[in-house]
């Protein structure tokens, strides 16, 4: 079960990293949108990390 959770977190981190990378051919008008998306992706990643920590703590308390 922990392997599945770990795999899910790794995939989420990789997706967030890929989404946060800016492309080299972006127009000046699109830069603002990309910055907004990058900010949202990093916030989503932080929230997902906090949820994962809470879930792992809850699972740890349940097992012991």
Swiss-Prot record:
The gene is pgla-a. The modification Leucine amide is found at residue 59. PGLa and PGLa-H display a broad-spectrum of antibacterial activity against a range of Gram-positive and Gram-negative bacteria. PGLa also displays antifungal activity against C.albicans ATCC 14053. PGLa-H shows moderate antibacterial activity against the multidrug-resistant methicillin-resistant S.aureus (MRSA) but exhibits very little hemolytic activity. It comes from Xenopus laevis. Residues 1-20 form the signal peptide. Expressed by the skin glands. Synthesized in the stomach and stored in a novel granular multinucleated cell in the gastric mucosa. Stored as active, processed peptides in large granules within the granular gland secretions of the skin. Keywords: Amidation, Amphibian defense peptide, Antibiotic, Antimicrobial, Cleavage on pair of basic residues, Cytolysis, Fungicide, Hemolysis, Secreted, Signal. One of its GO terms (cellular component) is extracellular region. The keyword DNA-binding does not apply. Belongs to the gastrin/cholecystokinin family. Magainin subfamily. GO terms for biological process: defense response to bacterium; defense response to fungus; killing of cells of another organism. Residues 21-35, 60-64 form a propeptide. It is found in: Secreted. This is PYLa/PGLa A.
